[in-house]
Amino acid sequence: MKPLEKFLKKQTSQLAGRTVAGGPGGGLGSCGGPGGGGGPGGGGGPAGGQRSLQRRQSVSRLLLPAFLREPPAEPGLEPPVPEEGGEPAGVAEEPGSGGPCWLQLEEVPGPGPLGGGGPLRSPSSYSSDELSPGEPLTSPPWAPLGAPERPEHLLNRVLERLAGGATRDSAASDILLDDIVLTHSLFLPTEKFLQELHQYFVRAGGMEGPEGLGRKQACLAMLLHFLDTYQGLLQEEEGAGHIIKDLYLLIMKDESLYQGLREDTLRLHQLVETVELKIPEENQPPSKQVKPLFRHFRRIDSCLQTRVAFRGSDEIFCRVYMPDHSYVTIRSRLSASVQDILGSVTEKLQYSEEPAGREDSLILVAVSSSGEKVLLQPTEDCVFTALGINSHLFACTRDSYEALVPLPEEIQVSPGDTEIHRVEPEDVANHLTAFHWELFRCVHELEFVDYVFHGERGRRETANLELLLQRCSEVTHWVATEVLLCEAPGKRAQLLKKFIKIAALCKQNQDLLSFYAVVMGLDNAAVSRLRLTWEKLPGKFKNLFRKFENLTDPCRNHKSYREVISKMKPPVIPFVPLILKDLTFLHEGSKTLVDGLVNIEKLHSVAEKVRTIRKYRSRPLCLDMEASPNHLQTKAYVRQFQVIDNQNLLFELSYKLEANSQ
């Protein structure tokens, strides 16, 4: 399990899919590629030059830690080159079909999982509830749609079948609606999707009798499901909002035709109001309320607040530092571009009266605790959620770029007893689960699709997912930090014992995200090398930790983990990076479009994965948390960890504790 220590080395490069221009070599677990900032995959300080960020080129290579990836290709074999439109080349074809399977979805004859002798299984029917990258795509349970269709015609075909009742039962209709709504953005942009829906309803208005009525009812059903799924995500899409409003007015004109659908039209009215943001004037719109990003400010009242979902138009406070470590505090939209941020900094620095070109003389740089620097391009946006755990934004001139150094308090941590020595494992585990449930609930299910499939375009829609991934990395570094700051060998062994207890309790709470993060923190190379400390651990806890390592073992596509989570009932907090890995294999393992034709089986498999996430959150979390005298203090501690994310510094601390350990 040694590769576990490589988990989410650096959010700036791993989560955002960026190429980092680094300072000093990062070593294991630092920014850059597998070798860190100064190793293979990282920029090498001044020699690396000022390199811009390349975001999310491939989630399987950039987001996922090494232990989650598939084995490398054989020497001499070139990886598939993505074709125009972002689709990977070299997709396997269906035997005997002459090409990939598109819209004709029929059961393949013959024995085995691909053949007859039983119904085709959906991904959720596997023992793991997680789609294995090695499994074939699965056909949807609804009837075949017939001949291949282009994206602009597929929606019409689906609406025709809904209007004609060809799906035979309501369950198949619901799955059909859900598949198209969840995955339409893979082949049809949202605004285009709504335009097609609007045009279909207008054409149905010229038809007489049951046929026209059936088409309008199908259009109403599709719009309702679309709005019910997207809701808040559409609040920032002005073009989509106008189309929805026009379609809503058309439907309400024919309200008398929907006597049997009175509840649906009422629901439509409520949903459209949500999209249009009809908020009383005396209340400040949510998009204008300043929301705290954890780690930006350490005020107790902020970190104790229940987490709410972020949107691109939300405003936050953020510090932007100067080369001398002075700073200005700016108020900015979460989706603000680098150019907008520099404009706010320029105004704060009272440069506004200078010549117009003065703003362009400043650049924005993300500097990590290890000294690695990333030059941000003026057109980049949503940079706040892509920052690493201890990374900060610096505004400087190009001449002072090389002189930038990290803030001193981030690389000088005084050892000694911390809060972890005073709290009970049960309290820590429960607060971890409660906080991570809040963060997990904030992630819209479509953020997973946008993150994997849309890259740059989905940046502002994936802020909550990126914050959850950043938190997972933070917990991992917190475990390593606390162990390595404990100088007394006896206390250090007790701390290992406490963290193993916390991992066990998180697993009991069905919080597998925290469980994974704690185990990987203990498996950090700087911690696992402390042989003398581990020898002091009782045999019972050594055996328990071995079981945890086996559970997090990536062998056979994480078989142990998948078997455990398949037996859990909601609510469950899954190990989110593994969901992204599965979606990435779906994306890169088969094409969405070939010659303009839509691969329906891929859409259905992606939708099944999203429904798995929905299932995990289908019930509320209920923890038996007794209010202790230090309840708020423990809650604040768990939500605002102070960590060292510089792996070189962690190794230095480790060698000071046990210089000769192997």
Curated annotation (Swiss-Prot):
Keyword field: Guanine-nucleotide releasing factor
Function: Probable guanine nucleotide exchange factor (GEF).
Start-end of Gly residues biased regions: 20-48
Gene Ontology molecular function terms on file: guanyl-nucleotide exchange factor activity
Keyword field contains Metal-binding: no
Ranges for region Disordered: 1-149
Composition-biased stretches (Pro residues): 73-82
Protein name stated in the entry: Rap guanine nucleotide exchange factor-like 1
Domain Ras-GEF span(s) in chain numbering: 424-660
CDD domains: RasGEF (cd00155)
Entry's Gene Ontology BP terms: G protein-coupled receptor signaling pathway; nervous system development; Ras protein signal transduction
Biased composition regions of type Low complexity, renumbered to the chain: 49-64, 120-135
InterPro entries: Ras-like_GEF, Ras_GEF_dom_sf, RASGEF_cat_dom, RASGEF_cat_dom_sf, Ubiquitin-like_domsf
SUPFAM superfamilies to which the protein is assigned, alphabetical: Ras GEF, Ubiquitin-like
GO (cellular component) term, any one: plasma membrane
